[in-house]
From Swiss-Prot:
HAMAP family: SHMT. CDD domains: SHMT. It catalyses: (6R)-5,10-methylene-5,6,7,8-tetrahydrofolate + glycine + H2O = (6S)-5,6,7,8-tetrahydrofolate + L-serine. Pathway: One-carbon metabolism; tetrahydrofolate interconversion. GO terms for molecular function: glycine hydroxymethyltransferase activity; pyridoxal phosphate binding. Belongs to the SHMT family. It is an enzyme of class 2 (transferase). NCBIfam families: PRK00011.1. Keywords: Cytoplasm, Isopeptide bond, One-carbon metabolism, Phosphoprotein, Pyridoxal phosphate, Transferase, Ubl conjugation. The modification N6-(pyridoxal phosphate)lysine is found at K248. This is Serine hydroxymethyltransferase, cytosolic. Transmembrane segments: none annotated.
Length: 469
């Protein structure tokens, strides 16, 4: 049969990006160049593998598959079902749990939606949850609100009450959390963080959840790769539900997973009968059709590939080095006289206080960007406003993926220290009536030979390390 449409149309759909859309292709190449020649210290970022990219760019993206394996709303899903089941099996294996005790949803599209989907599955509107206070290292999706405004949609749909860290130590104040939880009686206790560098005491969290009758939900988005590798403790022994993104330390595609308990939850003290978990159907229903339509099948395939990699000895070697590199950050910052929130790290990142240096995180972030270092400004305990964050968050996973070791991370800290000193000089040079952030940026944008020199050094140095594309 002849091809009905024109040859031009055939060429349109079969030609590569460089030929059909050079403008988009050029921007992509510019971004690859930036990644190749920059030091990426964003704690939530990583560089995924070539094989994950291979899986992402496949015709699996063409297929609609609303529903779950064996129960789809469309035909033609034989191979899509195989892929999703494989991904689920690999997810359980990667985190060392078995299907008799745990199930997993791999369709959820991202971390914050995954958390909302869990809440909606097990709570009615305006029921209560508790999560770590955002400026103390928590996350928006754990119910953040200010005195005057509900910031996260979670805090709009549900009532939230934060727990805090001890302001002296920077460690979660479990005693106060327990007292407040018993009084507040949340339906869900969230154990998870986005800028907390110490290990969470999951056993204590379980005890607190039991005392107030709450589900214990662990959000391991930042540390799931470390957990899969077995280099830090796992929450699965204690949690009822575990959520994670898939693109941070796990080093997969951008996505998320929701793990949920199966089997016996408790024994009824009056009847002696087993009380079973009822999480699987509510969570799956919350994901689809509650919040989503068709899943992203190309992402599920890429996640399956990443999970296979996460079960290898090479992945454990990588995560072990991540911890070593984070400790290298800790030691070098301390040697230079910086204060670290919680006095250090047990994980993949450090949170550096800049209050003692007389500058804030936004200014240091801006200087670092000028010299090809990507990190992020971050609130620290005691900050009065998220608009003036008192610190910077610095992570090790991305540059560890590219092959950097402890000595490289010592050198990175030296450059960050130079950026802090440069920021101090710029800020001190500004008149009192023109010292806002926009004034600071304008002054920096006037140009500096020193910044240009540092940028060239980092450009060349970062370019020595491989970048998978």
């Amino acid at each position: 049969m002849p091809y009905t449409l024109s040859d031009a149309h055939h060429k349109l759909i079969t030609s590569h990006l460089v030929d059909t859309d050079p403008e988009v292709d050029s921007i992509i190449k510019d971004e690859i160049e930036r990644q190749k020649h920059s030091i990426d210290l964003i704690a939530s970022e990583n560089f995924t593998s070539t094989s994950v990219f291979d899986a992402l760019g496949t015709p699996l993206s063409n297929k609609y598959s609303e529903g779950y394996p064996g129960a789809r709303y469309y035909g033609g899903n034989e191979h899509i079902d195989r892929m999703e089941i494989l991904c689920q099996q690999r997810a359980l294996k990667a985190f060392h749990v078995t299907p008799d005790k745990w199930g997993v949803n791999v369709q959820t599209l991202s971390g914050s939606p995954a958390n909302l989907q869990v809440y909606q599955a097990i709570m009615k509107p305006h029921e209560r949850l508790m999560g770590l206070y955002l400026p103390d290292g928590g996350h928006l999706s754990h119910g953040y609100a200010t005195e005057n405004r509900k910031i996260s949609a979670v805090s709009t749909y549900f009532e939230s009450f934060p727990y805090r860290v001890n302001p002296e130590t920077g460690i979660i104040d479990y005693d106060t959390l327990e007292k407040n939880a018993i009084l507040y009686r949340p339906k869900v206790l969230v154990a998870g963080t986005s800028a907390y560098c110490r290990l969470i005491d999951y056993k204590r969290m379980r005890e607190i959840a039991d005392k107030c009758g709450a589900y214990l939900m662990v959000d391991m988005a930042h540390i799931s790769g470390l957990i899969a590798a077995g280099v830090i403790p796992s929450p699965f022994e204690y949690a009822d539900i575990v959520t994670t993104t898939t693109h941070k330390s796990l080093r997969g595609p951008r996505g998320a997973m929701i793990f949920f308990r199966r089997g016996v939850r408790s024994i009824n003290p009056k009847t002696g009968k087993e009380v079973l978990y009822d999480l699987e159907n509510p969570i799956n229903f919350s994901v689809f059709p509650g919040h989503q339509g068709g899943p992203h099948n190309h992402t599920i395939a890429a996640l399956a590939t990443a999970l296979k990699q996460a079960a290898t000895p090479e992945f454990k070697e990588y995560q072990t080095q991540v911890l070593k590199n984070a400790k290298a950050l800790e030691s070098e910052f301390k040697n230079l006289g910086y204060r670290l929130v919680s006095n250090g790290t047990d994980s993949h990142m450090v949170l550096v206080s800049l209050r003692e240096k007389g500058v804030d995180g936004a200014r240091v972030e801006y200087i670092c960007e000028k010299i090809n270092i990507a990190l992020n400004k971050n609130s620290i305990p005691g900050d009065k406003s998220a608009l003036v964050p008192g610190g910077v968050r610095i992570g090790a996973p991305a540059m560890t993926t590219r092959g950097m070791g402890e000595e490289d991370f010592h050198r990175i800290v030296q450059y960050i220290n130079k950026a802090v000193e440069f920021a101090q000089q710029v800020q001190q040079s500004l008149p009192k009536d023109a010292c806002r952030l926009k004034d600071f940026k304008a002054k920096v944008d006037e140009g500096s030979d020193v910044l240009n020199t540092w940028k060239k050094e980092i450009y060349d140095w970062a370019g020595e390390y491989p970048l998978a594309v």
